[in-house]
Amino acid sequence: VSKKRSFLLMRRSFKMQKKDFFLCGFTGWCLEIFWTGLHSLFTGNFTMMGKTSLLMFPVYGLAALIRPAYRKLKGFPVMVRGIFYSCGIFFVEFLIGSFFQKLHICPWDYSHVPLQYKGVIRLDYAPLWFLTGLFFEWLLRQNPRKVS
């Protein structure tokens, strides 16, 4: 493969990853607004007001990493992939949440709930992250990217 062809492939791959990043970022924002709106309803607020933070866009954009992970995991059962994704989401949530806490800009605080760790992750969200990871896998598979 010539250097020029390698460069063009790398550039094309970067553009595709950027599209995945934006797709996942916008989708994550929408999911969070929907989730917080439902939570608002269940706590008696019938306006069903949902919310998110601008800081969350790049965090959700990282779900684009599921595409390369899926390429390695596609031979595994859905349960294994879901567990892998939920562990990955917990890991990213912990790292980014801890970083945001140090800067005093963390948009979430789980310190008031029982199954939390350091206020940045909720262990009772494991089933939610399992399903969310599989949802992002499905979403990214609906938008195939090929590098040739």
PLM feature spans:
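Aromatic-rich, lipid-facing transmembrane alpha helices and their immediate juxtamembrane interface loops
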Residues: 9-148
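Polybasic, lysine-rich low-complexity intrinsically disordered segments
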Residues: 3-5
